[in-house]
Amino acid sequence: MSQILTAPQAEALHKAMLAYLSVINAPQTAETLREELHFDESYNEATCKKFEGVLEKKWTGIARLQRRINDLEAEVRSLQAELEASPSAARAKNQDPTNWLPKPSSTHTLTSHRDAVTCVAFHPVFTSLASGSEDCTIKIWDWELGEIERTLKGHIRGVSGLDYGGQKGNTLLASCSSDLTIKLWDPSKDYANIRTLSGHDHSVSSVRFLTSNDNHLISASRDGTLRIWDVSTGFCVKVIKSATESWIRDVSPSFDGKWLVSGGRDQAITVWEVSSAEPKAALLGHENFIECCVFAPPASYEHLATLAGLKKPPPATSSCEFVATGARDKTIKLWEARGRLIKTLHGHDNWVRGLVFHPGGKYLFSVSDDKTIRCWDLSQEGRLVKTISGAHEHFVSCIRWAPSPNTDNPDPAGEKAGKKDAVKPSYRCVIATGCADNSVRVFS
């Protein structure tokens, strides 16, 4: 005690302790302590009265100070996050793309659709952006110039999903619709409709190319099935049935195309192995329809492993480790792909409609019917660090990140994600969102 308190401070503390014991009616304990401390007759009733309440005041004072310290530390963290997200901070970091967050105002607002925009997709090489709408059309834009290039007509009901993919040097655009079909469009032939894939028994909700086979794509439908198609022949090569046979709203492949994650009306997320077409895990926890699901890229493994309490992150070569999902229950959930819930992110005030990971791995972006884009920092336990309020004037239905050009690796981090001495990946800091206000917005 002598090393912490001065002699007068120690004496005052002892007197306060004796006074406290007297107040709580513990005379025997007080007398024992008085003898141990060798207090003489100078410690009388008047001294006791003088020190009554001192111990309690110091205790409550410390509690108030601790609360104030906690509040100040939280404020410092918030200000630090804002500082790091500010344009000036970005300049100070030499425009480090790993810390890029979209500005509140969009670079371009693209208007031409006559009904709600439901989906968007970026060309993997060129500055082309495709958007699909309830007006049954697909529009191709130059996102860099903010100009429309062409309108594709062919679907007879609303377009619900889009994706670019296929063989290198022969990129195709796939679209799906409530008209039960999937259509393939060839950009090298002025986006001619080269093939229509039929087989689903209800609306087709989502379509994505598989990188494990350049000729294969996966579709999800309200008929309760996932179907794998050979785009070169137009034939369905595999049908995957959900256990509940309920509406599958979304499907997303892993970066190597070996795994799928799907979710929908039954409120369950399923992880599938493509080669066996068998479910490998069921992720249960949402309380309403699943609207979107996506695998985390290896660049985010470090942060998600910390959230999951793992001693070290999984290898960057592993493609099926973590999953993010959004639902009509207004929440985003982060999962281990084996089925364990890691974190639930609260903040949206309406249905969560779309998710995309920042290729740098640090952030997760989400869009919602609450008209916002929200940015969640995975390095801060999924903390909400930025909200773009009024990103659109109506429900925000979809979000996509522009892929990196001139790369053969679909994962932006690649196998170098775990190497500290590896060269930092380069990628486009561009996102596009679609909305029920009939517009597409580009943030770059």
Swiss-Prot record:
Q: Fetch the InterPro entries from UniProt.
A: Dynein_regulator_LIS1, G-protein_beta_WD-40_rep, LIS1_N, LisH, PAC1-like_LisH-like_dom, WD40/YVTN_repeat-like_dom_sf, WD40_repeat_CS, WD40_repeat_dom_sf
Q: Which residues form a coiled coil?
A: 60-88
Name the consequence of L72A.
Impairs self-association
Q: Biological process GO terms, please?
A: cell division; conidium formation; establishment of mitotic spindle orientation; microtubule organizing center organization; microtubule sliding; nuclear migration; sexual sporulation resulting in formation of a cellular spore; vesicle transport along microtubule
Disulphide bond pairs: none
Primary location group: cytoplasm
Pfam families (UniProt xref): LisH_PAC1, WD40
| Sorted UniProt keywords | Cell cycle, Cell division, Coiled coil, Cytoplasm, Cytoskeleton, Microtubule, Mitosis, Repeat, Transport, WD repeat
Q: What would be an example GO MF term here?
A: microtubule plus-end binding
Taken from the UniProt entry, a GO cellular component term is: cytoplasmic microtubule
Cell compartments where the protein resides:
Cytoplasm, Cytoskeleton; Cytoplasm, Cytoskeleton, Spindle pole
Q: Which residues form the signal peptide?
A: none
Residue ranges of the region described as Disordered: 83-107
The residues covered by the LisH domain are 9-41
Instruction: Give the recorded effect for L65A.
Output: Impairs self-association
Where the WD repeats fall, as residue ranges, is: 112-153, 155-195, 199-239, 243-282, 285-345, 347-386, 391-437
- Reported impact of L79A: Impairs self-association
What is said about its interaction partners and assembly? Answer: Interacts with dynein. Self-associates. Interacts with bnfA, nudC and nudE.
Q: What does this protein do?
A: Positively regulates the activity of the minus-end directed microtubule motor protein dynein. May enhance dynein-mediated microtubule sliding by targeting dynein to the microtubule plus end. Required for nuclear migration during vegetative growth as well as development. Required for retrograde early endosome (EE) transport from the hyphal tip. Required for localization of dynein to the mitotic spindle poles. Recruits additional proteins to the dynein complex at SPBs.
Membership in a protein family: Belongs to the WD repeat LIS1/nudF family.
- Regarding domains, what does the record say? Dimerization mediated by the LisH domain may be required to activate dynein.
* Protein name (database record): Nuclear distribution protein nudF
Origin organism is Emericella nidulans (strain FGSC A4 / ATCC 38163 / CBS 112.46 / NRRL 194 / M139) (Aspergillus nidulans)
Gene designation:
nudF
